[in-house]
């Protein structure tokens, strides 16, 4: 079964409930080839949690240099756009083998990686020919989904003082991005024309 960004609160709640009798969740690993998209989530946990350990690791490095504390008290949140990156598939498989809760962020409905996920979250993506249509829900794109996992994990394990403000801001992000795109469109086109051969 696939999930969307609006399901993340319940996904985290379910994971915490499943893991409570074995000591709960102690750490979360953000893993993938799309590391840039995962950085805000890793940083959020590092800055806002007093009890959770967080790391941000390339898929291949994670497989070949797995952290010692990775196991049944872990969440691994993987980003794999088309679900076919061999190293990320191996990292997801390792998560299953170690008993971690495996969350996969992906765009495609069907792919190789989904068999290794406990929760498959399909994020929004602008699939228009030039990726510039801008008609997606930006609150549901990959970076936001990873951040939602982080925010919900911290909030549900130890509380997060700015939780309501976070969701208020998340509700504004699509309009902010659309307005910004309109505002800079002419300047962006002029810049591209001027520097296209540099």
Question: Over which residues does each language-model region extend?
Answer:
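Conserved N-terminal alpha-helical segment that immediately precedes and caps sugar-phosphate-binding
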Residues: 1-198
